[in-house]
Regions:
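Pore-lining transmembrane helices
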Residues: 1-264
Length: 264
């Protein structure tokens, strides 16, 4: 068990999938090599998986927890700076092979901080979807826009500069969410939706659920057109326009080249 009072962010299932692949390949390597293959193959697969988990998980978990703590520390800043820092960091966490939803849930990222988190996630998901449209067309638009921007990680490793348009976009939309529209995430699920962005529209549904809950409890008088305008602009319009504009600039100066954003 983890020590009391310590918040732990578990490694993403993406890391678990990578470990499973390595373990499976090791199992295949010894398959059909012995007369007791039915025992050796699963034994090697299990042992390799357990060994890699014991080796990698503590370090990855510690790094994810430290990253989450950094996000939590940013929530005490003034709304403008908090909007920038939280939006950028949660957006980065969403695209990295760690779970932004787990981080937001573990640290209870709700209220204005939750709204900034939604802005950062949308900046990465919608941003990458629009930024890479010329390479990936409609399939890429859907898979990244309502799926995950994590699909771009192999391309980011090859050319980290392709991430700059989405990061800059999140730095702009975050403070707009907190200071202009006062976008809050008060979903009863306690922060999970804050780290989901447009994935299945969970972030937007979470914001709406929070509005409904606030109206029911008397915290909010009513859901206004200004609320809807803010949600639509922060979630879809601004990420698409800003990331496309930033991307156009970086393409012109040669930092992003044709094919850099192609999904394999």
């Amino acid at each position: 068990a983890w020590p009391k009072g310590r918040t732990v962010v578990e490694p993403s299932i993406t890391i678990g999938a990578a470990i499973a692949i390595v373990a499976a390949e090791c199992g295949k390597a010894v398959s059909k090599e012995t007369k007791v293959d039915i025992l050796v193959t699963p034994l090697v697969t299990i042992c390799v998986g357990v060994a890699l988990s014991a080796w990698w998980a503590p370090a990855i978990g510690a790094a994810a927890s430290a990253f989450g703590q950094l996000i939590k520390d940013a929530t005490v800043l003034q709304p403008f700076w908090m909007g920038i820092v939280v939006s950028v960091l949660v957006g980065i966490a969403l695209t990295l092979p760690i779970s932004s939803a787990a981080i937001c849930a573990a640290f209870g990222l709700t209220g204005l901080a939750g709204g900034a988190a939604v802005a950062g996630c949308c900046a990465n998901m919608v941003g990458f979807a629009v930024l890479s449209f010329r390479e990936n067309r409609w399939g890429g638009l859907v898979s990244q826009g309502i799926g995950t921007s994590m699909l771009q990680m192999p391309n980011i490793v090859r050319n980290p500069r392709i991430w700059l348009p989405a990061i800059l976009t999140s730095a702009v939309t975050g403070p707009i969410a907190t200071c202009v529209f006062r976008l809050e995430m008060n979903d009863p699920a306690s922060g999970v939706a804050s780290g989901m962005g447009t994935c299945g529209l969970v972030g937007q549904i979470g914001v709406y659920s929070g509005w409904v809950n606030d109206v029911a409890t008397g915290v909010k008088a009513a859901i206004t057109p200004f609320d809807w305008l803010g949600l639509i602009l922060i979630s879809f319009v601004l990420p698409a326009v800003l990331c496309w504009a930033f991307g156009l600039f970086f393409r012109r100066i040669g930092w992003i080249k044709e094919g850099d954003l192609t999904l394999s």
